[in-house]
């Protein structure tokens, strides 16, 4: 029988897990944009290409190895790729990286959404956290196919809303694109080109840690061609979203101090005076939280499922694992948004270089090329 066509092809569903995991509230709020790009001036419009080249390379090599060898979980991946003895050590290092990412990226997700909803609707932070945990757990109940498909649909919504915000902010607001470029050096918080390049590379390394989320749905891809399409699609869409938000914020740097705002995108939307657009942005943030949290939680389910076999019901087991992992994220959020944004992302990024990034571009890449 002919397979039923879907609005979300498998490769695009995998790409959506990457995009959704990346496009969490840290980026959706604009906080990542000003932290890693806008503060360097106009050069920050170009450096995302470098950052996502690093992330995309790691994604492709590790995703393709996981697909080819049937190891969506990073523990069996480590033992298959590095051997039984060394693989055991690498798996522990992966555990450390994953849990750090869960606390940092997940913490940013909860904290960013909590700040937005508390300021916009007066909703208590823990109410936001509990609802997010429950919905993310529901998305993880039925495995990789549901997660990839649901992430794909949410990705369509995210792309549409970001493009709409960009167009309206640039055409209906009081932005000053000409002034932003003309006074780029004066408005930049750091005008060093070298710092901008190093910052982009560090950001690319930090985002490489979400490779475990993408690997966890590798089983929905049928061949290497689909893996390549997934990563290429993820790269292009992520770059478009990043540049849209960065350019939107950059265009206001000559109007007010964008980089000083905790929620830069909302600060721009407030200047537009469009209440409906603010509501749409709140929906965007909620989708960003759910895709980011669900992607992290599913990767954790694939990894820790074996430790919870004492719970016989598979769906209940996934729910419990998700609740525990997102509870760790909620604890990270309690440390504060700025702490996670400044110190947390830097620590995770530096840790990822020797544990994930360098091995992916050398050892794992060589095995993928050889088909070993």
Predicted segment positions?
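Extracellular loop-to-transmembrane helix junctions
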Residues: 6-9, 35-63, 233-243, 344-357
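Juxtamembrane transmembrane-helix boundary signature
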Residues: 49-76, 248-255
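Transmembrane-helix boundary/entry motifs in multi-pass membrane transporters
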Residues: 2-10, 39-44, 68-101, 119-125, ...
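Hydrophobic, membrane-embedded alpha-helices of multi-pass small-molecule transporters
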Residues: 7-28, 101-102, 169-174, 182-239, ...
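Hydrophobic alpha-helical segments and their helix-loop junctions in multi-pass secondary transporters
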Residues: 25, 136, 140, 157-187, ...
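Membrane-water interface regions at transmembrane-helix termini and the short interhelical loops
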Residues: 109-119, 133-154, 220-223, 328-343
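Membrane-interface interhelical connector segments
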Residues: 249-275
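Transmembrane alpha-helical segments of multi-pass small-molecule transport proteins
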Residues: 11-21, 46-53, 91-99, 119-143, ...
